[in-house]
């Protein structure tokens, strides 16, 4: 948890000040401002733990337990050894510099461990308007200074797993090198990163692009200079290291060397061709440069690869690949040397997606290799490791694959691999979803198994598309990129599983029925299967709907206020509506394809839409829409709008662009007219939360620019005045996808970020409340029935669902279910219920929203657990003093 500082500056907003003026004009000619209040908030993440690609892990070579991780869109992190967690370092990055949350490289200074550097920038094409920068810190990332570069950097571009592109000279730590993309060559600083100049003597800026024909500029960009490695044996303290190796994205000329501290350079003679060198790691003690090669830049692709060893004294090259070239269907990338035992080398098959990634290990400098898993008799395999993902149980993806696939997988996109330079037993590696690690790695060599588990707590890297906070049930439901989304029954615990049945790769939109919050709908992207799903138990369980013809993506979706009908605006076809749960769809009339859709939160027949500056209204359940007469709204589609819970026809709309109308609008007549709020220079999201104690109108939240300041704002008086609730240390880059308050906790706000997960804030004064807690300690009487199902099982772990049915004649107002495991099973995490354990006996109690169970009704909860030996089912379940029947 991090606490913001109370802002001391107050700015004033005059009514009507510059209403409708474009933000560019405001920036050029700032007007006087007054009285914009600020509040002190505490901020933390709704825990997911990971959720995105970690392309780089860097250990400091001279200070034990000092390590950093970089992400492609979610900033950089420092390892906290005492808690085994990661601390975010770039939350200060603001709206205008959002691209600086993409980190292309991190360098930790081995001479002065307090110094750390980050090369930042997300895209090299026009998706990111800003140039890259090098950030420098003298306090391990607590604070930063920035040097802007004359070119862009690509933390989320193809080739981002190669590296490290940024390096500090281990002898003269005022000297740094940076490998640039896009043909900009090699750059050097001689004043500890304050200023930079191109190394004009370096002969090759690279020429490899993933897809030269890509007109967007994303895949067609030259991946440039990919890594810099110093030979520390060729220097002394205070003088620049003489021998420097540089990797280049050029399949014929992938490695260069300087032996005069960068004055001159030459192509390394005798090197292999036809591949890109993803990594170059030097073992100065034995005089070897190890290189991991792939036929592409990754991180997704790569069909062939090799490992080579270069003898720095003789110039001899040796192919040390653990697999014959003809047998590779993957490239190599992750590469590390055990600094305590430099003859020990490890590498990853980063692009082996099926059946799993592979990790190779050699203890004789690449002479012979063993691998993390191997086939016994296909498709059966034997692992040298065990995996325990009980701390992040969703990493199983709810899957039950056929051999040789296993769940959880060892990984994919495994381009970051590092052995702790002070501890041969500790290794960390990044995947497309998490950081895994072990602290008994040398078991590998003794023939016993080493234990892998997530080492990712504190690192939150999901991109958030939508958020809802229902008035009952789970406090938060999220729609996420890559991992689909979660039902967050607790904000401080990792959810057990992402949404499944179906499991969207990306959930694009999410809604619930305001008057019946158990009914939830989501839409999203899926290669094969439906693009829409429904839940009747507040998102705990799901079932897929049926797609209308032509659907290619999730789009936006809205649930009627009573949950009886839905309107869907998917990609690939026009707006559709249905009664029931999406078994049959009909085309809506009067509204264009691609419109954003939402529902009125009171009238179940009223739905709203927006497209290209026009607001649309349907009063017949989405069958027909009529264009509103409202004018002056944003002309583009960069708009989010919502209807107020409990306020029929009360609609708020945020959005726009710098070259046109931009701000926040309010309608009280169902969208027939809108009034633009004065003083809100720009706004991109709007949401609602519990009213303040002395207010009659719900609290408003927005990600906006107000009073010339970008931030997260709160209003308790219907938008008349605004309070900034974040500060400059907590900005999280781009926050324009979604925002919502909490209808049960005054002041709480959930903010969608583009790579830092879901952050939520509470008032520091203590009004923020806590997570909705469990209900009373109940012992209901009456008949009961239990259905116990093991839904997934893996080595050492399992997942189970429990369905408890009231078969009596009286309603329960709270319940408490007891059972005893017959073996050594232990519950590690439970959702939709609170649990306690004494030995092997477990008690599961209701939470507040599922305490009431009518006769004939059921309640379901689930859990993950650990086991060894056998995983037999409990023989009986008891509700108070009554033994339940079994289904």
For the regions a protein language model found, what residue spans apply to each?
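Extracellular low-complexity, O-glycosylation-prone Ser/Thr/Pro/Gly-rich "stalks"
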Residues: 767-887
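Extracellular glycan-interacting surfaces
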Residues: 2-771
């Amino acid at each position: 948890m991090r606490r913001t500082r109370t802002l001391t500056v107050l700015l004033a907003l005059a009514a009507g000040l510059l209403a409708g003026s474009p933000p560019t004009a405001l920036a050029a000619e700032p007007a006087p401002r007054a009285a914009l209040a600020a509040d002190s908030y505490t901020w933390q993440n709704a825990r997911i733990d990971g959720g995105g690609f970690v392309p780089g892990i860097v250990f400091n070579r001279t200070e034990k337990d000092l390590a950093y991780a970089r992400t492609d869109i979610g900033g950089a992190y420092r390892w906290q050894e005492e808690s085994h967690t990661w601390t975010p370092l770039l939350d200060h990055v603001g709206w205008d510099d959002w691209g600086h949350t993409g980190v292309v490289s991190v360098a930790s200074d081995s001479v002065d461990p307090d110094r750390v550097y980050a090369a930042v920038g997300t895209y090299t094409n026009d998706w990111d308007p800003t140039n890259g920068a090098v950030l420098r810190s003298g306090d391990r990332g607590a604070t930063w200074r920035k040097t802007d570069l004359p070119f862009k950097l690509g933390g989320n571009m193809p080739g981002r797993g190669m590296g490290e592109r940024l390096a500090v000279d281990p002898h003269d730590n005022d000297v740094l090198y940076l490998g640039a993309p896009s043909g900009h060559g090699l750059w050097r600083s001689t004043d500890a990163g304050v200023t930079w100049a191109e190394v004009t003597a370096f002969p090759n800026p690279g020429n490899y692009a993933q897809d030269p024909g890509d007109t967007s500029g994303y895949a067609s960009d030259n991946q440039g200079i990919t890594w810099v490695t110093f030979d520390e044996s060729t220097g002394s303290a205070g003088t620049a290291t003489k021998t420097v190796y540089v990797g280049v994205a050029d399949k014929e000329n992938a490695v260069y060397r300087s032996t005069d501290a960068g004055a001159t350079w030459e192509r390394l003679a005798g090197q292999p061709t036809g591949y890109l060198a993803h990594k170059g790691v030097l073992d100065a003690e034995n005089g070897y440069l190890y290189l991991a090669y792939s036929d592409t830049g990754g991180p997704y692709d790569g069909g062939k690869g090799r490992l080579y060893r270069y003898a720095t004294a003789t110039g001899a090259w040796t192919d040390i690949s653990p697999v014959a070239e003809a047998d590779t269907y993957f490239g190599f990338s992750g590469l590390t040397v055990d600094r305590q035992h430099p003859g020990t080398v490890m590498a990853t098959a980063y692009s082996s997606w099926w059946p799993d990634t592979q990790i190779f290990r050699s203890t004789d400098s690449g002479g012979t290799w063993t691998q993390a898993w191997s086939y016994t008799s296909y498709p059966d395999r034997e692992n040298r490791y065990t995996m325990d993902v009980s701390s992040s149980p969703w990493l199983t993806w709810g899957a039950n694959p056929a051999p040789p696939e296993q769940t959880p997988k060892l990984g994919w996109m495994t381009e970051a691999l590092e052995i702790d330079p002070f501890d041969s037993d500790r290794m960390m590696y990044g995947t497309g979803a998490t950081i895994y690690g072990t602290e008994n790695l040398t078991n590998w060599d003794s023939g016993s198994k080493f234990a892998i588990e997530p080492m990712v707590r504190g690192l939150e890297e999901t991109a958030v598309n939508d958020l809802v906070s229902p008035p009952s049930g789970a406090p938060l439901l999220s729609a996420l990129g890559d991992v689909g989304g979660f039902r967050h029954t607790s904000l401080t615990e990792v959810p057990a599983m992402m949404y499944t049945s179906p499991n969207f790769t990306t959930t694009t939109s999410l809604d619930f029925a305001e008057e019946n919050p158990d009914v939830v709908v989501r839409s999203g992207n899926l290669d094969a299967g439906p693009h829409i799903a429904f839940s009747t138990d507040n998102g705990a369980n799901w079932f897929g709907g049926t797609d209308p013809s032509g659907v290619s993506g999730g789009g936006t979706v809205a649930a009627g206020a009573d949950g009886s009908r839905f309107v869907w605006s998917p990609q690939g076809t026009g707006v559709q509506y249905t009664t029931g749960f999406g078994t049959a769809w009909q085309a809506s009339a009067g509204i264009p394809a691609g419109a954003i859709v939402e529902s009125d939160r009171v009238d179940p027949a009223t739905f709203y839409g927006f497209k290209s500056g026009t607001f649309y209204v349907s009063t017949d359940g989405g069958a027909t829409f009529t264009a509103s007469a409202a004018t002056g709204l944003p002309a583009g589609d960069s708009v989010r709008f919502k209807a107020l819970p409990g306020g029929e026809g009360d609609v708020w709309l945020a959005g726009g662009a710098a070259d046109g109308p931009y701000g926040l609008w309010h309608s009280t007549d169902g969208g027939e007219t809108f009034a633009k709020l004065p003083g809100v220079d720009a706004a991109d999201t709007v949401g609602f939360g519990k009213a303040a104690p002395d207010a009659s109108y719900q609290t408003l939240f927005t990600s906006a620019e107000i009073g010339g300041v970008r931030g997260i704002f709160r209003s308790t008086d219907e938008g008349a005045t605004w309070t900034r609730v974040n500060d400059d240390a907590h900005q999280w880059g781009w926050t324009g996808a979604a925002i919502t308050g909490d209808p049960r906790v005054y002041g709480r706000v959930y903010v969608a970020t583009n790579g830092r997960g879901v952050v939520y804030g509470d008032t520091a004064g203590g009004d923020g409340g806590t997570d909705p807690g469990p209900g009373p300690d109940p012992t209901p009487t009456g008949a009961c029935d239990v259905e116990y199902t093991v839904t997934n099982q893996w080595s050492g772990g399992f997942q189970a669902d429990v369905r408890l049915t009231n078969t009596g004649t009286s309603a329960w107002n709270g319940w408490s279910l007891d059972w005893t495991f017959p073996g050594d099973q232990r519950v590690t995490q439970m959702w939709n219920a609170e649990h306690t354990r004494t030995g092997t006996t477990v008690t599961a109690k209701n939470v507040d929203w599922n305490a009431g169970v009518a006769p004939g009704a059921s309640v379901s909860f689930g859990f993950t657990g650990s086991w060894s030996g056998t995983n037999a089912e409990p023989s009986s379940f008891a509700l108070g003093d009554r033994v339940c029947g079994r289904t």
